[in-house]
Amino acid sequence: MAAETYEFEPEWVVIEGSEVRAEALLSGQIDATVIDYENVVNVLLQAPGEYHVLISFADQFPGLMGNGFFARAGYIEENPEVIEAMIESLLLTYRRVNDDPDYLFTQAPKFLPGINEDPEKLRQIVDAYVGFNVWDSNGGFTAEAAGLTVDLYVEVGDLEVPAEFETWAVLEPMNNVLERIGRR
């Protein structure tokens, strides 16, 4: 898409794994790449001022789903209370972090041993993730967002035909939680 928009012919190279692409970028083996937020932060911290974010999918494709939590349909049907408890816990944590990034800064060392060895780096990581709006306060999972994501995958050739939402997703647990805790 970008090559067509900006009329250039890139040399395409397939490198599996965001962390491997980040290392290839840092070592000068490639000039540009798509990497996940964790590796964006790592690259920016390892080489300050040498690399810049060219496109943020969150900005260019609002509503695009990047990640998700998956479970077998049978498990979801048999354990709705467990699924909803997990979703509620995640959303309340997302909201707390979005409202008060210092909360994550103080909690991260409890769960990530060694992370507090470099508090400035941890601060930059927290600020970057919050700045990238990684944690949507409402979960970011809607039929509309899913449709946009599937359409993009079809457009770029990752899917041959659109997958019908109902065949791979269920909104009921998310909607039940949002009904209880409210939407933001």
Please provide the spans of the model-predicted regions:
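Ligand-binding cleft/hinge of the Venus flytrap
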Residues: 1-14, 44-48
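Glycine-rich, flexible loop/turn motifs
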Residues: 65, 72, 137, 161-164
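Glycine-centered small-residue hotspots that permit tight backbone geometry or close packing
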Residues: 16-17, 133
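Residues that cap or flank secondary-structure elements
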Residues: 13, 31-32, 141
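Secondary-structure end/capping motifs
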Residues: 78-160
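Pocket-lining segment of extracytoplasmic ligand-binding domains
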Residues: 19-114
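Surface-exposed charge patches
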Residues: 1-3, 23, 41-42, 151
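Conserved C-terminal helix/tail region of periplasmic/extracytoplasmic solute-binding proteins
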Residues: 147-184
